[in-house]
């Protein structure tokens, strides 16, 4: 008997996304679609979007962690573009990676050149035993 007369109900397994199979939060399917539509190559392998999504997720997590630390240092509970800028520019590798990137509303790193800083005075007594003859520039 071929069993054509019996109605066998096959329960289809619940669809599992490629992101969940890879243990990622970033969408593997969307990355795959963007790779195909972007005219980067004629064909895109099955592992390429998984790898790219994992790399993007890692970089995002790294930047967000550093930006969260910058926000906490400034006693803020919300990350703003300034915190992203501080996070990226204070990290050597991220700064090299994102060297040509401008972050809108990010500002600049506080930096004063060493030659512009005031000279350190030597306690007021010179080597000859007399008091230093430096006068203030206030008139």
Swiss-Prot record:
PTM remark: Phosphorylated. Phosphorylation of Ser-136 (H2AX139ph) occurs in response to DNA double strand breaks (DSBs) generated by exogenous genotoxic agents, by stalled replication forks and by meiotic recombination events. Phosphorylation is dependent on the DNA damage checkpoint kinases ATR and ATM, spreads on either side of a detected DSB site and may mark the surrounding chromatin for recruitment of proteins required for DNA damage signaling and repair. Widespread phosphorylation may also serve to amplify the damage signal or aid repair of persistent lesions. Monoubiquitination of Lys-120 (H2AXK119ub) by ring1 and rnf2/ring2 complex gives a specific tag for epigenetic transcriptional repression. Following DNA double-strand breaks (DSBs), it is ubiquitinated through 'Lys-63' linkage of ubiquitin moieties by the E2 ligase ube2n and the E3 ligases rnf8 and rnf168, leading to the recruitment of repair proteins to sites of DNA damage.
Pfam families the UniProt entry points to: Histone, Histone_H2A_C
Gene Ontology cellular component list: centrosome; chromosome; nucleosome; nucleus
Cellular compartment(s): Nucleus; Chromosome
Main location (coarse class): nucleus
List of residues that carry N6-lactoyllysine: 10
Record remark: domains: The [ST]-Q motif constitutes a recognition sequence for kinases from the PI3/PI4-kinase family.
Protein name: Histone H2AX
């Amino acid at each position: 008997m071929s069993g054509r007369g019996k109605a066998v109900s096959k329960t289809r397994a619940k669809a599992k996304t490629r992101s969940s199979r890879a243990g990622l939060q970033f969408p593997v399917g969307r990355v795959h679609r963007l790779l195909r539509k972007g005219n980067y190559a004629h064909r895109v392998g099955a592992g390429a979007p998984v790898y790219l999504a994992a790399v993007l997720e890692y970089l995002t997590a790294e930047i967000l962690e550093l930006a969260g630390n910058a926000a906490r240092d400034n006693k803020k509970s919300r990350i703003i573009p300034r915190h992203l800028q501080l996070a990226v520019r204070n990290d050597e590798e991220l700064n090299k990676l994102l060297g040509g990137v401008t972050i809108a509303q990010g500002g600049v790193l506080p930096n004063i050149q060493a030659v512009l800083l005031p000279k350190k005075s030597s306690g007021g007594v010179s080597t000859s035993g007399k008091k230093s003859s430096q006068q203030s520039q206030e008139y």
